[in-house]
C-alpha cells in the first residue's frame, strides 16, 4: 500500500485535476482486494452512495491498540479514496487516530474541493467509522 507521505508528494507534482483523478483511481487499483467473506452488512459503511466496506484489526496494547484497516469499494474513484483513508489511519494507535484531521489532509492535497457532495459525504462517513472504531477501543 502506498504511504501517506508518498501520496502527498505525488499530489504535489500533479497540477491538473484530471491527473489527480487518474492517480486516485490508480491508488484504488493498487489496494489489496478484500475477501468476499469480509463484505458483510456489518462491515459496510453507512452513508456512502457507493458500497464501501471497512474491517478493523487491533493488535498490541489493550489500553491503546494498534489499528490496521482493510477497505473495499465497488466504485473506482471511491476505492481510491478508501486507499487514501487507509494510508492516513492504518497502522496507528487508537489514541492517535482520534486526533487526526483527515479532512484537512484531503484539503491539503486538493481533493476535497473536487469531490461531489455525495462522495464528500461518503468520505466523511468512512472517517467517522474509523474514528468511532478507534474511540471504541480506548478505555472510557
From Swiss-Prot:
Signal sequence, renumbered to the chain: none
SUPFAM superfamilies: SufE/NifU
Domain of life: Bacteria
Database matches in InterPro entries: Fe-S_metab-assoc_dom (IPR003808)
Family: Belongs to the SufE family.
Protein name, UniProt field: Uncharacterized SufE-like protein R01000
Organism annotation: Rhizobium meliloti (strain 1021) (Ensifer meliloti)
Taxonomic lineage of the native organism: Bacteria, Pseudomonadati, Pseudomonadota, Alphaproteobacteria, Hyphomicrobiales
Amino acid at each position: 500500500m502506498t504511504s501517506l507521505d508518498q501520496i502527498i508528494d505525488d499530489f504535489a507534482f500533479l497540477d491538473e485535476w484530471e491527473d489527480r483523478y487518474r492517480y486516485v483511481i490508480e491508488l484504488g487499483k493498487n489496494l489489496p482486494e478484500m475477501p468476499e467473506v469480509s463484505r458483510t452488512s456489518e462491515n459496510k459503511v453507512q452513508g456512502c452512495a457507493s458500497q464501501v466496506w471497512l474491517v478493523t484489526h487491533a493488535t498490541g496494547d489493550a489500553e491503546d491498540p494498534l489499528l490496521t484497516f482493510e477497505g473495499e469499494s465497488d466504485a473506482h474513484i471511491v476505492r481510491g479514496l478508501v486507499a487514501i483513508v487507509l494510508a492516513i489511519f492504518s497502522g496507528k494507535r487508537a489514541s492517535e487516530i482520534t486526533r487526526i484531521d483527515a479532512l484537512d489532509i484531503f484539503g491539503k492535497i486538493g481533493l476535497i474541493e473536487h469531490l461531489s457532495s455525495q462522495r464528500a459525504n461518503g468520505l466523511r462517513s468512512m472517517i467517522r467509522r474509523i474514528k468511532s472504531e478507534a474511540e471504541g477501543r480506548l478505555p472510557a
